[in-house]
Structure formats: structure tokens, C-alpha cells
């Protein structure tokens, strides 16, 4: 009951504040970031809008702090980051004096009404029971589907802990202002593609090139009687490289026992493929996809993305079940079953 009362109180305040903050008058702001020590002095800080990554302003750290001042036409969900570091924090850029204290254990913005709500969202997400997440998420998105708080919710556990059906429902239920944002449109499309290629669905075919430039299809490998372990990867991707020993192990063990390992080279320049193959000692076939066709069709938001497809073309497993230490046992579950 206390949690629901907290949510109700925050929702009332959010509604009142957003009404005040959507007046057409320009927004003037001062954003001050306080950094822990002088080692940051001289470094560049970038203020960007979340999701679009559009740069709003830059500053240089002096005296262990940075300051952004300006005028914006509406409240925006942003983040400030010391360039090329993991020192960053989210905030809502709005009228008033906003402070980010990087000495805090958890850096959250203070000083303005909408940023107080952002802090409350984090607090609620930290304390809410998992079984209440769906109901609370539905309530908040219903109230804030067309304002800046709705965009904050989209980046919170009140969205990303939901299943794909609920996520699609939240985004499609947004008001036109938010739903017309390009990154929301893309996320709806991605989620629907992910849903269409989830475990139990038939594989979706696509074309790419092999290492010598010939056109090849996923169906050249899938549906031929073998289990196919598909790995979408790139040469610059650290987590992708960490999966290569696991892929090599199952490839060497089971390449003659009903398993085909297939790499899909994505989000990378074709010139990087051969050096990566040589460096990592990759011996399995590759499809080169420079047009992002495969990752779009399969709703992939990050790599590596690995899936196991059965002999009949049915998707059997995706991601966690065939990543890391789970890969070999999962493969063996299918290959060695009686």
C-alpha cells in the first residue's frame, strides 16, 4: 500500500509539473556537474539527448566541474558524459538549476521538478516487487505516454523488464507526440521482428555475401538436416570475441555429428573480416551482411546475437541459452538426445 501511495503521489506531481513545463515559453537552464577530483580537469564533457545521441553542447572541465547554460524549446531527456569515459549521468534538461554530483554513489540530477520525478522513478524501480511491475508500468505509461516522463519510462525497468508483448503494447499505446519519435518507431519495428523470430518460430531467410563475394542465403545452411548455430558478430565487439572459443569448441566437437556453426558478419566493414578470421582462428563459414538485413529481420539490438535453429528450420534457442557456459550443454541437449 505504501508503494502504491508513493506512485500515486508521484504521478500527481508529475502531471502538475508537466502541465507547467509544456508552456511554449523557451526553457533556460544551468546544468552544473561536480566531479570527484582534478584528474578530470581539461577533459571534454558532452551533453547529448538520449536515444538520438544528438549533441546539445560541449564544455571543458575546470576546477573539478563543468557548466552548461542555454535555452531549449522543450524539456529533453539527456545525459552528460566526460568524453571517452564511463563517467556520465542522465537528466531531464528543463528550466532551472540542475546539479549532477559525481561524488555520489549513484549520480542522479537534483534541483528541478521533472528531475525529482526522474529520481522517484529510479527509487520506485529499486523497491517495487517483480509481480507488481506489469501493473505499475501500465499505469505510468497510460498517464505519461505523451510527455517527457514517458520517454524516461521507456529507458527504465518499468519498460525493459517486460516481455515483448507488453513492451509493444506500451509503445503502441503512447500518444502521437512520443509515438512519432523516430527511435520509438524503430523500437516498435524491432520488437515486432523479435517477436516474429522468437523461439518456436520458423527461421526467416536473408541474403548476404560469402568471403569471395558470392551471394549466399541463410537457407543455404538451414533446413539441410543439421542443427545450425548462428552467430551474429563483428570484429570490434569484445563480447563477440569472448564467444569465439565456445563456438570453436562445439564446432570442433560436433561439425561431423549434425551441427553447423555459421557466422553472420554484421555492423562492420568487410575489410575487417579476414584479419579477424585469421586472428581468432575461425574455421566455420561466414555470411557477410553489410546492409543490416539480418539484424533487422531478427530484431537484434546488440551483438553477439546467437541462435540455434533445428534441422526443420525452427528456431530452438536464442541468446542466453546458447551464450557462454550454456552453449555446449544446450547444443548437447539436442544433439545427444535419444
What annotation goes with each model-predicted range?
Residues 145-156:
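Amphipathic alpha-helical repeat scaffolds of TPR domains
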Residues 278-282, 289-336:
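Thiol/disulfide oxidoreductase modules built on the thioredoxin-like
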Residues 258-272, 282-292:
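Thiol-based oxidoreductase modules, predominantly thioredoxin-like and allied folds used
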Residues 232-249:
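Conserved redox-active cysteine motifs that mediate thiol-disulfide chemistry
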Amino acid at each position: 500500500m505504501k508503494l502504491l501511495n508513493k506512485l500515486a503521489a508521484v504521478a500527481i506531481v508529475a502531471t502538475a509539473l508537466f502541465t507547467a513545463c509544456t508552456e511554449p515559453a523557451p526553457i533556460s537552464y544551468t546544468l552544473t556537474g561536480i566531479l570527484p577530483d582534478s584528474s578530470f580537469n581539461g577533459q571534454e564533457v558532452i551533453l547529448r539527448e538520449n536515444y538520438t545521441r544528438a549533441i546539445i553542447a560541449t564544455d571543458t572541465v575546470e576546477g573539478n566541474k563543468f557548466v552548461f547554460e542555454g535555452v531549449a524549446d522543450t524539456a529533453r531527456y539527456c545525459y552528460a558524459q566526460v568524453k571517452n569515459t564511463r563517467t556520465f549521468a542522465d537528466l531531464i534538461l528543463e528550466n532551472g538549476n540542475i546539479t549532477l554530483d559525481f561524488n555520489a554513489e549513484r549520480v542522479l540530477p537534483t534541483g528541478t521538478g521533472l528531475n525529482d520525478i526522474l529520481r522517484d522513478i529510479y527509487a520506485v524501480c529499486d523497491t517495487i516487487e517483480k509481480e507488481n511491475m506489469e501493473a505499475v508500468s501500465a499505469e505510468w505509461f497510460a498517464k505519461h505516454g505523451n510527455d517527457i516522463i514517458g520517454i524516461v519510462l521507456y529507458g527504465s525497468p518499468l519498460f525493459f523488464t517486460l516481455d515483448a508483448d507488453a513492451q509493444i503494447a506500451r509503445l503502441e499505446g503512447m500518444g502521437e507526440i512520443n509515438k512519432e519519435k523516430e527511435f520509438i518507431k524503430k523500437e516498435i519495428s524491432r520488437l515486432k521482428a523479435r517477436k516474429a523470430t522468437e523461439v518456436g518460430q520458423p527461421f526467416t531467410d536473408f541474403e548476404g555475401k560469402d568471403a569471395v563475394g558470392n551471394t549466399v542465403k541463410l537457407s543455404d545452411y538451414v533446413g539441410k538436416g543439421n542443427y545450425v548455430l548462428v552467430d551474429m558478430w563483428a570484429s570490434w565487439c569484445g563480447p563477440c570475441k569472448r564467444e569465439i572459443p565456445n563456438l570453436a569448441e562445439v564446432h570442433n566437437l560436433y561439425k561431423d555429428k549434425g551441427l553447423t556453426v555459421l557466422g553472420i558478419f554484421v555492423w562492420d566493414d568487410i575489410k575487417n573480416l579476414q584479419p579477424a578470421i585469421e586472428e581468432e582462428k575461425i574455421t566455420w563459414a561466414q555470411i557477410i551482411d553489410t546492409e543490416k538485413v539480418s539484424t533487422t529481420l531478427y530484431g537484434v539490438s546488440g551483438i553477439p546475437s546467437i541462435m540455434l535453429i533445428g534441422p526443420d528450420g525452427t528456431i530452438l534457442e536464442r541468446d542466453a541459452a546458447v551464450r557462454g557456459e550454456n552453449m555446449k550443454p544446450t547444443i548437447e541437449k539436442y544433439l545427444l538426445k535419444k
